[in-house]
Amino acid sequence: MEFKIDEQTLNDLELFNQALDGKSIFSCFNTACSDGGKACIRKMLESPLTDVNKIRERAEAIRYLGQLPFFLDIRREELSFIEVYLQQEDVPQRSMYHLTSRAVKGWLKPDNDCYLRQRAVPYLGRLIRELGTFMDELSVGKVPEMIRDMQQRVKETLAREGMQYLMSQKKDSFWTRESLDLYFRGRELDGVRVILDTLYMLDSLRSLGTMAKDEGLTFPIFTGSERRVRIEGLYHLFLENPVKNDV
C-alpha cells in the first residue's frame, strides 16, 4: 500500500518548499549526481514507506552504499543524452534492408537523428558494462537484500540477447552502433529501462548514505516488541547551533 503525503502536510513540513533561509528538507538530501537519482529521492519523500520491513531494507541499503569504498562513475550529461535518445519516436525496424539503408544514409549524409544515435549508443553501452561490472564486484553474501534484488534483476537483464550482443562486441564502429540501436530502442528497451532505473536508485541510495555519514546522522534501530518511535538527540538540520532533544 502506497502512502501519499497531501499538499498541506508537504508545505507544513517544508519538504520541498523553501524556508526563509532558502532551504528545504529535499534540498538537504538532494545530493544525487543524476537527474534520475534526484527524482528517486523526491519520490521517497512524497510517498514514504509504511511497511517496517521495507523501511529496514532501504535503511540497510543506504548505509551499505554510503560506506562502500568504490562506486559507479555517474556522468549526468551522458545520462541526459541517453534519455533524449530513448525518446526518439522513429523506432528502428529489424530488417537488413532498413538497417543498411539507414547506415549508408547516416554515413554519407548524417542528420541530427544519426548524430544522436552515434553519440548515445556508446554512452549507453559503456553504462551497461560498468553497471554489470559494479554489481559483480559486490560480495553477494554481504550485501543487503534490496541490493541483492537489484543484482538479480541486472543479471537477468544482461543475459538477454541484445545485451549479450553488446558484451560480445570487441570494437566500436559505425555499423555496430547502428546494430545496437535496433536492440536498445527495440526489443531490449524494457531491459535498458531496468538498467537505467537501477542506476538511478543506486545513485540516490549512495548519495543519501554519503550525506548521512558526512553529517553524522544515525540510522533507525528496529524492534519487534512494540510499535512506537523513540528519538534521542533530535535536532533541526537548518539551525547552526541546534539544541538536541529526546522525543
Predicted regions and their residues:
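Conserved amphipathic alpha-helical "coupling/scaffold" segments
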Residues: 1-161, 165, 198-201, 234
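Low-complexity, intrinsically disordered or weakly predicted helical/coil tracts enriched
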Residues: 4-8, 192, 214-215
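Intracellular alpha-helical coupling/juxtamembrane segments of multi-pass membrane proteins
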Residues: 55, 150, 157, 181, ...
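Generic recognition of flexible, low-complexity loop/linker segments
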Residues: 29-30, 188, 217-219
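Mixed-charge, polar/low-complexity N-terminal
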Residues: 8-9, 13-16, 20-22, 174, ...
